[in-house]
């Protein structure tokens, strides 16, 4: 019985690897992962074989976000509080973001549609802490092309409190992006629309109710 369980786990893990590899082959923006203690894994655009690398300054047990260009070159990464460039050096203004290194999904990074030089870091603080959900803009023309966080568009609050979960998906129009988070204490998902015009925090979000309320260990 244990043998069959182990075989099932191996098969499941193998299918996940194949699925992830196929996704990465289609979009180089997710081809570099940095996590844990100084660890990283990279997929070249021409292959689905991962290559391990070290040297990152990161030390964390929880969430990290990375972003690469369509040619699979690492651009920058963040643990929700600090931001490092492709050379593993902290950006000049890449500090003090209101996420948390102890947040399970501390940040997600997305490109601004139709603008190859602008990215947004959406951060979620540790459960129910004051940072909540916020965003900061990264200008890739700054810092000699290595990018920097725009001090005039940094830690822009969206809502609070928020849980530690966040994700992003493409809009059905193939251009825009939805950033999705769960609200605290209810069953609402909040979807924030990012377009070529930027982020509309007044009219650019949809609230959907489904599932069970998120209220700590008794929720999702």
What are these regions (language model features)?
Residues 92-95, 145-158, 200-211:
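Beta-propeller fold detector
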Residues 1-30:
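Bacterial Sec-dependent N-terminal signal peptides
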Residues 173-220:
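Beta-propeller domains
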